[in-house]
């Protein structure tokens, strides 16, 4: 409801009527419904990744395979394509099919200035892009997103995380020179060693200039 007050909202769901009954009285002129089957709720991970290419809005549609084939993703992997076929996006938006490359939105973090932050644990997972080495992954991402550099975190995890250490649960850019991150100060906690190592890695990162 708070989002609708500020932005137009796209809702993908199996049953529009059920969602309307939960939302109640809102400004539905700001809501776009698209009914389709889904597996889960994580639009950040299965949804298209948007960029501007010489001022033209582009949506990359990567493969979503349920966080490394842990969960069913047969419906979620089709959502972005179905949205395009259903004329959901503006006419100037260009869809680009990025198959067979597997990539979730939550596995990468950008400062918007040419630097991308990610984790080795996730992107190098054998259940995603199993035949690509880290250098090949880096070259591919730099080419696709027009990056100057990629910062790889080798440490950091959260218990119960099924994503293989998505960076969006560990560290996020606040600006091009500031990163907020998860910290653990309890030496008895199972996360202490890994998050301390991650903190040291982050301290070694420098600005591009």
For every predicted segment, state its role.
Residues 1-209:
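The feature marks the mature, well-folded catalytic cores of soluble enzymes
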């Amino acid at each position: 409801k708070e989002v609708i007050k500020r932005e137009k909202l796209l809702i993908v769901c199996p049953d529009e009527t059920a969602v309307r009954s939960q939302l109640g009285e809102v400004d539905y002129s700001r809501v776009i419904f698209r009914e389709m089957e889904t597996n889960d709720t994580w639009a950040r991970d299965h949804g298209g990744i948007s960029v501007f290419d010489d001022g033209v809005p582009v949506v990359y549609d990567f493969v979503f395979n349920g966080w490394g084939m842990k969960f069913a993703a047969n419906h979620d992997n089709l959502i972005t394509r179905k949205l395009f076929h259903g004329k959901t996006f503006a006419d100037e938006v260009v869809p680009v099919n990025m198959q067979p490359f597997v990539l979730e939105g939550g596995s990468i973090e950008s400062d918007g200035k040419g630097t991308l932050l990610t984790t080795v644990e996730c992107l190098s997972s054998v259940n995603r892009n199993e035949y690509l080495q880290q250098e090949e992954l880096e070259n591919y991402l730099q080419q696709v997103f027009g990056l100057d550099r990629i910062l790889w975190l080798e440490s950091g995890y959260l218990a119960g995380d099924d994503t293989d250490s998505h960076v969006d649960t560990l560290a996020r850019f606040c600006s091009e020179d500031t990163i907020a991150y998860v910290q653990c100060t309890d030496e008895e906690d199972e996360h202490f060693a890994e998050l301390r190592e991650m903190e040291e890695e982050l301290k070694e990162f420098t600005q591009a200039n």
